[in-house]
Curated annotation (Swiss-Prot):
<keyword id="KW-0251">Elongation factor</keyword>
<protein>
    <recommendedName>
        <fullName>Elongation factor Ts</fullName>
    </recommendedName>
</protein>
<comment type="similarity">
    <text>Belongs to the EF-Ts family.</text>
</comment>
<dbReference type="InterPro" id="IPR018101">
    <property type="entry name" value="Transl_elong_Ts_CS"/>
</dbReference>
<dbReference type="GO" id="GO:0003746">
    <property type="term" value="F:translation elongation factor activity"/>
</dbReference>
<dbReference type="InterPro" id="IPR001816">
    <property type="entry name" value="Transl_elong_EFTs/EF1B"/>
</dbReference>
<keyword id="KW-0963">Cytoplasm</keyword>
<feature type="region of interest" description="Involved in Mg(2+) ion dislocation from EF-Tu">
    <location>
        <begin position="79"/>
        <end position="82"/>
    </location>
</feature>
<dbReference type="Pfam" id="PF00889">
    <property type="entry name" value="EF_TS"/>
</dbReference>
<dbReference type="GO" id="GO:0005737">
    <property type="term" value="C:cytoplasm"/>
</dbReference>
<keyword id="KW-0648">Protein biosynthesis</keyword>
<dbReference type="InterPro" id="IPR009060">
    <property type="entry name" value="UBA-like_sf"/>
</dbReference>
<comment type="function">
    <text>Associates with the EF-Tu.GDP complex and induces the exchange of GDP to GTP. It remains bound to the aminoacyl-tRNA.EF-Tu.GTP complex up to the GTP hydrolysis stage on the ribosome.</text>
</comment>
<dbReference type="InterPro" id="IPR014039">
    <property type="entry name" value="Transl_elong_EFTs/EF1B_dimer"/>
</dbReference>
<dbReference type="InterPro" id="IPR036402">
    <property type="entry name" value="EF-Ts_dimer_sf"/>
</dbReference>
Amino acid sequence: MQFDVEKIKFLRNKTQAGIMDCQKALINSKGDIDQAIIFLRKQGIKKASEITGKILGEGLTNVIIDNNEAVLYELNSETDFVAKNKIFLDLLNLLGKILLKETKPNMNIDEILNLKFEDKKIKDLLLEKTAIVQEKICLRKVIKVIKKDDENFGMYKHQNGFISVLVITKNSKKDVSEDIAMHIAANKPKFINKEQVDLETLNQEKSIIEAQVNKELGNEKTFNIKEKIIEGRLNKFIQNICLIEQSFVKNPEQKLRDYLKEKEVEIINYWRLEVGERI
């Protein structure tokens, strides 16, 4: 059975499937375009589910803000080539709209993947795009945030989404919140201040520093001198991981806490996503 080129072309544009797949779908549906589209979708999902699970270390992050709500998320692919593909980028933007509207704070990824958009679950949408690009696409992280009326959002994206940051501040103008978000992207803090640093983190780092100092100095220095060196290095470690103790990225001579004091701004919370982090 032969079909005219225009019908195949229309089906390709509609589904982004290959020529041979479009021909097969038209044969199966006896030329019915709607049935051919259904056939291709079913075949695509079947193929996508068979694609083996490689480590998805590429992709993009994104952050979207709408009034008091924001969503931060990471969409992964196997290769950088697919992450730059229009199909992937369109999916990234579509997911942002869906996630901003449909998700709630503290939803787990399984709950999110089972959310429906136009009678289609998010996980099925991902499978469809996986079938088209012939490479697994995965929604790995989603963070939904709701702020209070008297708080401010700030956001920053580095390298078109390799890193995305969202920050909540109080008494802050837009440019100040964005500067703080940019600083977080660059300096990768783990806590806002010293008080948030947990005992497990401190003890783990202290044991590492103690081992380093003992190896470096051996029996050359007294216990008290070693303790002072260990204390100094531990304080330096705390400064490096605590946001407000870090040197401000736009003015390294100034601590971020001094910049915040100068601007009379308080940091409430922040979130930072980097592609492939902790995979």
